[in-house]
């Protein structure tokens, strides 16, 4: 099995200008999106060797809520990764992969446009990762292949929870 990089965009957050950007919180809808993403990944049997999140409040909370649907061992693998706070390039975001076994999985929880740009850098494919959405890239050699792209509505359906019409 090839190494996999999974990406989870934070759930819907408070509007810009309500507080400092790094302090913006998830809305109730964003919290539901994060829980649904975690539940869907658990239902699909996806487990992670490492879970890295942006230190910004909305991304940290997304990671925590998603992980709340996983085993205790999975929850203990969460940690902040400063490059995910924004403006990174693939080498910076993927530096932590050295800690992951050759066939392992890492989950990156962060922001746009960085996550979609990362998918593009790795695969050459343009994607639109929605708030609360998930993508996965299978890495092989110097590039990768887009393996999964799920919108929040699809994640809610997989998780078996009501959708918010997104």
Where are these regions (language model features)?
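Short, small-residue-enriched loops and turns at beta-alpha junctions
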Residues: 86-87, 155
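A structural signal for short coil/turn segments at secondary-structure junctions
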Residues: 45, 70, 100-101, 141
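Conserved strand-to-helix beginnings and helix N-cap segments that scaffold or border functional pockets
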Residues: 90-91, 119
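Non-DNA-binding regulatory cores of transcription-related proteins
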Residues: 99-133
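Active-site-proximal alpha-helix that buttresses catalytic centers in soluble enzyme cores
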Residues: 2-82, 88, 95, 125-129, ...
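Domain-level recognition of soluble alpha/beta enzyme cores
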Residues: 123-158
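Short, flexible active-site-adjacent loop segments at beta-strand->alpha-helix junctions, enriched
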Residues: 11-12, 57, 84, 112-113, ...
């Amino acid at each position: 099995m090839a190494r996999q990089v999974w990406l989870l965009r934070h759930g819907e957050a408070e509007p810009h200008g309500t507080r400092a950007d790094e302090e913006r919180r998830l809305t109730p809808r964003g919290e539901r999106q994060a829980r649904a993403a975690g539940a869907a990944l658990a239902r699909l049997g996806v487990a992670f060797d490492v879970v890295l999140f942006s230190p910004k409040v909305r991304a940290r909370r997304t990671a925590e809520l998603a992980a709340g649907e996983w085993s205790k061992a999975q929850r203990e693998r969460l940690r902040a990764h400063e490059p995910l706070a924004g403006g990174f390039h693939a080498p910076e975001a993927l530096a932590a992969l050295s800690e992951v076994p050759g066939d392992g999985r890492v989950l990156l929880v962060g922001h746009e446009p960085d996550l979609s740009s990362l998918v593009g850098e790795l695969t050459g494919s343009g994607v639109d990762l929605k708030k609360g959405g998930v993508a996965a890239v299978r890495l092989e050699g110097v590039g990768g292949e887009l393996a999964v792209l799920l919108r929040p509505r699809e994640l809610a359906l997989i998780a078996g929870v009501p959708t918010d019409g997104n």
